[in-house]
């Protein structure tokens, strides 16, 4: 959790939960028979938070950003989801080996996508710049 000043000068609490990884079962309990039957998967953050349980910590009116250890964005919810009550639903993300942060929806560019071309840095979403080597590899991959 981090606190940032919004445009109106008011401090607001934002979630930034880091490094989710797949686990067999939540540490605070074993799998239920129903979870075994359907083959349920679980994620746990580096500070021990269960993915399903910590989703309630995120605000319904903030954009959600899923990013890797280098800050590259691979998932984003920057528009309300009609199937989730027109909220910015963090449940749309599945952050295996990723972190999830929230920012004010107005601070998330409309054209931001989870395609690796954007970065999450210091609480902000910015267009990614590529090194010459990354550009060469990208061009080679597009030839295939």
Label each PLM-derived region with a short phrase.
Residues 2-144:
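Interaction-interface detector
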